[in-house]
Amino acid sequence: MPRVKRGVQARARHKKVLKQAKGYYGARSRVYRVAFQAVTKAGQYAYRDRRNKKRVFRQLWIARINAAARQNGLSYSRFINGLKKASIEIDRKILADIAVFDKVAFAALVAKANAAL
């Protein structure tokens, strides 16, 4: 069996990792062994935070809706309950947007939700 040195594949693999580590500080962008660890950890963080992002944004929307609903004299839970009873199906992302940018329309939604309770 002939000896296999894998020089080309190793160089390609190292280049790929170092390209992904571009912009990292110090040895993390220059030394393969350190860069590999940094890129691997970055991938783990990215994977985890793609899932966390959904939770964080939902929390933000709920906080904004709650604040706007309370300004109109209704708690978040009663507001959502009223919307469901009035069969108004607007998701929390859009409700939060309306609460921030169109206070008149949000006040109308609160009135409808209050009437349905």
Swiss-Prot record:
Record has DNA-binding as a keyword: no
Instruction: Return the GO cellular component terms, semicolon-separated.
Output: ribonucleoprotein complex; ribosome
GO molecular-function annotation terms?
Answer: rRNA binding; structural constituent of ribosome
Give yes or no: UniProt keyword Disulfide bond. Answer: no
> Which InterPro entries does the record cross-reference, listed alphabetically?
Ribosomal_bL20 (IPR005813), RIBOSOMAL_L20_CS (IPR049946), Ribosomal_protein_bL20_C (IPR035566)
- BP GO annotations: ribosomal large subunit assembly; translation
Return any one Pfam family short name. Ribosomal_L20
Q: Which UniProt keywords apply?
A: Ribonucleoprotein, Ribosomal protein, RNA-binding, rRNA-binding
User: What's its job?
Assistant: Binds directly to 23S ribosomal RNA and is necessary for the in vitro assembly process of the 50S ribosomal subunit. It is not involved in the protein synthesizing functions of that subunit.
Mind telling me which PANTHER family this protein's record contains? 39S RIBOSOMAL PROTEIN L20
Family, similarity comment: Belongs to the bacterial ribosomal protein bL20 family.
Spell out the protein name for this chain. Answer: Large ribosomal subunit protein bL20
Q: Which gene encodes it?
A: rplT
